[in-house]
Amino acid sequence: MQFNTYIYMLLFLPVTILGYFVINKFSYFFAKIYLAAVSMFFYAYAGLPGFQWLVISIIFNYLVVLLMKRMHNKVILWIGIIFNIVLLFYFKYTNFAILTINDLLHKSIPLTKMVLPIGISFFTFQQIAYIVDSYRGKLEEHSILDYINYVTFFPKILMGPLVSPNVLLTQFHDESKRKISSQNMVDGIQMFIIGLFKKVILADTFAKAVAWAWRIGDFKQISSMDIFLVMLAYTFQIYFDFSGYSDMAIASAKMLNFELPMNFDSPYKAYSIRDFWKRWHISLTKFLTEYIYFPLGGSKKGEARTYLNTMIVFLISGIWHGANWTFILWGILHGIFSIFDRLVEKFRKNIHPALQWMATFLTINVLWLLFRANSIGEWKHALSQMLRFQSTTISDGLLNVFVLPETKVITKVFRLYFFEGNIRGFWMLIFYLIGFILCLGFENAYRRKYKQNVVTAIFYALLFVFILTCIGSESVFVYFNF
């Protein structure tokens, strides 16, 4: 079950909210049991084959914390951490390791047929955070019910945001959240619709442009301009897809009176790669900083150690994202550019902000192309074809992916025949303009002040109905497989 499905929006979420607040009137304890039950159902519905591993992981980690609280033994801490890492590596990287061995040693070891538990990268990191914070004395002992809710809370279990244990557990103990809040409900509904718009209207449309290029399969068959536009399309796709999901996750929690942390802060406004990582997937950056970078010494042990720690963090980030050398190289390159930013920080003041932004944005685009590529060789091939500038022609196939049934209706309603007939690629231009305007001209949805009035209600209601009519076959979120 994903946020952009009818069953979630029109059945699961309304029933969950209604049931939670009705049960809260009688018992906060039973309301938490209800919340745990619906969260477990949500996960099982999304990926039943991996459900038992989630349960095993929860039971093992909770027992580790109980033992650690009583014995305060660092060995138990490491047993818990190693268990989580081994579980993650077993499911996510076993076949990658086999393929690598086969390539290097010319072997033919068969691949395993295991099913990757959905969201394992996220719920594994969440539980490592809980174990470490418990060892550090930052957490009180919590009931198994609270722990289950912390790990499985349905708005964030599949793709985050990653939440600090204290942030969420404190809210589970706050009985003031038992009553429905009209402000939270309005904020949540409006934020959810914004996230849904990002995913269904923007991300899924840009995804069609990206899929068009990869469907052709050979970048020699398309022009340099095509490759550049597809690269830019993926930059927009991954942002609107993942930030749209985060908006819907935060909104779903808000309607239940829970606050999840902001995950994006207009990342494409960044003036450097370091600035980008303060704005992109913020919850992952905070996790890697607190649980890896700082324990390694952070920036307090000299420049060489700082650069080494930075590279370790970005290498782990790359590995965490996926089992492919493309992700590993993507992480390494982000680490190198982050170190470069540190080295030239004093000189950057002399460079015009517009040039800083442009250099950063182009770098991010090139690295996203690597993120999307099936292999490093494919990425290099795409880059070389793009940088040859052999043709500025835009293929009709690429232009046509932006002409949708919905755009035809808009053309008819607003009489846009002149523009559509005289501007080649009119709708592609519109989508790219919307992408830039939303990324660079608007504040983050998390920071937006939502209004309660009739006009706003009508606008969001109409927008929601329009989006519902645009949902075709279920499209998977980009980070769903991470």
Label the predicted regions:
Residues 1-435, 439, 447-481:
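Membrane-embedded transmembrane alpha-helical bundles that form the catalytic cores
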